[in-house]
């Protein structure tokens, strides 16, 4: 793990459309930490407890890739003690960090990101292209990697606030234990299944698939807005028919039209598999992961 990166910081941030929600301000906190999207916020809140005021940059239910920051929001970045972010995942955050030169911690310094799978796609002008050299950001869908990140965040908080270091380290240890238990539940729940192929809206589930011995087939690549090529669509339809796939997985924040069409053409059904980039209402990481496991077990006919 690399040391704290002095690239930027963030406080309560406003989206172009308004204030990011999801966490109330804690005026008595010892640290103010901004989290650029939900999984990082989840870890920060669990590890920081009452000692940390966690400010979410992205509003609940909003696609974090599309985050935009107003000039006033960028100005407020510099007032936080630390910003938690993932480089190259949200360009607006990267730009704000460069301009403010405040303290930040990149999740890529805590966990090893895997290369994105190469994926044929088409631009709006119809030209076909490929993904090259891109890293897959969705590490949090493997609970063991999120546990590694939690440990690193605990160390970061302890460095910034030594008086509460024991609390941060203990909270990180407790969260790691919870995530380890979740991993064990997934392992046992997906151990004996009739099928192991999952067709997803975009390639967000490679970490989960690798961890639990599944095969991901993404309709789109790492970028959920990318249109799949005709060849890719034909490949997916053939795979669905050849493997007896019964479910095409969709996402609440991604357009479902292509997935719906594939399901209609092949006689499959659709179900939500959530990449947990954002949450709404009373959901949190654990509750959404539990629903994901239920959806996978039903789709894959697991014992």
Regions found by a protein language model. Give the residues of each.
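Extracytoplasmic metal-acquisition and chelation regions
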Residues: 2-12, 16-303
